[in-house]
Amino acid sequence: MASDIAQERFAPDAPFRFVGGDPSVDFVNTADWTPRGLERDRFTSFDRLVEWAHGAELLDTAQARRFAQAAQRHPRRATATLDDAREFRHLLQDLLASVVSGRESTPSLDRFNTLVSNTARHARLVRAPGGRLTRGWDALGDAPESLLWPVVWRAADLLASAETDRLRVCGGLDCGWFYVDRSRNGLRRWCEMSVCGTAEKNRRRAHR
């Protein structure tokens, strides 16, 4: 039974949805945060992690290919990076939840700051097409673990911004996804109206 439950926790075929308004929020939204705990974990392999980062536009196609090659050269490090990604996702989920609820989460913040410090060592200014300077990364893609650097940095940018005032959690049953509410009136309730909003309407209809 325990092994069946463990298998049900993962969702290797579930699509990634980019509805959070920020890549770091979409990173947390790669699993469903239900009252029973984490379900439908879409990070089932390092390849899926690369697929998500490419879809979130944190990697271009060439960089995604480099990470796939790095995983072939360093399979154990790729597996360790997948484990680190899941652990970081839990940490970031706790931080986002603390922002939404207004509670303090000092242990999670301390751990996050350690990640930010370690990540900052790899940040560089690089020339973008056209000659403009932009932030880049030292040897991004040479090692599987470098995949998490852009995610950590985008999370730090978000948490240090005024956008946290617009951070919300979906009101859908068994969803728990977060999003930055940039609606005109600031009254968005769902991660996606077509998914959780419609499901809630159908539930209400069924109980009439």
Question: What positions do the PLM features span?
Answer:
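Short helix-coil boundary/hinge micro-motifs
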Residues: 1-168, 176
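BZIP DNA-binding basic region
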Residues: 147-208
